[in-house]
A protein has these predicted regions:
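Short, charged/polar surface micro-motifs in flexible loops or helix N-caps
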Residues: 14-19, 27-28, 40-41, 70-74, ...
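Nudix hydrolase/Nudix homology domain
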Residues: 29-32, 98-144
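Short hydrophobic/aromatic beta-strand or adjacent loop that forms the aromatic wall/cage
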Residues: 6-10, 84-88, 117
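The catalytic Nudix box helix
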Residues: 34-68
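N-terminal strand-loop-strand
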Residues: 1-34, 46
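Short, cationic motifs built from Arg/Lys/His that form the positively charged side of catalytic pockets
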Residues: 6, 51-55, 121
Length: 144
């Protein structure tokens, strides 16, 4: 039986030669991550990636520069019985984003009163492959 396919987006947000990433301070085992999420019904991937970037960072004004990759990820290797139809986009950061900041949002998958914090910071694009999971490397190659 083929698992369900869920449309997903990932945002590679750049400013000059740096990439915006985050860590979850209360979940250190999750590592360095990129803004990402699910495409909602009726949304295009382009609209979804902008929404996710705004929701997760707490800032608006991002611009889609390019589609980097579009691939199918089999999440069964991570113990999840689903496929992710993943669209990875290059976004340009708006002017005025700080060097570091914390933002959070509710986490509907963990209950109505749950909250998840994101500590955002910039890393040099040249170092990004050392910080991100291998599944992000193909899209990253289009930035470097």
């Amino acid at each position: 039986v083929t698992p369900p396919t869920i449309p997903k987006v990932t945002a590679f947000i750049t400013r000059d030669d740096h990439l915006l990433v985050f860590r979850k301070p209360f979940h250190p085992g999750t590592g360095t991550q990129l803004p990402a999420g699910t495409v909602e019904p009726g949304e295009t991937p382009e609209v979804a990636v902008l929404r996710e970037a705004e929701e997760e960072t707490g800032h608006s004004g991002y611009a889609v520069r390019a589609l980097l990759t579009h691939r199918l990820d089999d999440m069964r290797v991570y113990g999840r019985d689903e496929l992710h139809d993943r669209w990875s986009f290059h976004l340009i950061a708006p002017a005025g984003l700080p060097a570091i900041w914390r933002h959070g949002e509710s986490d509907p998958s963990s209950g109505p009163d749950s909250y998840i914090a994101f500590d955002f910071f910039w890393i040099p694009l040249s170092d990004a492959a050392d910080h991100l999971r291998a599944e992000n490397h193909p899209a990253l190659q289009h930035l470097c």
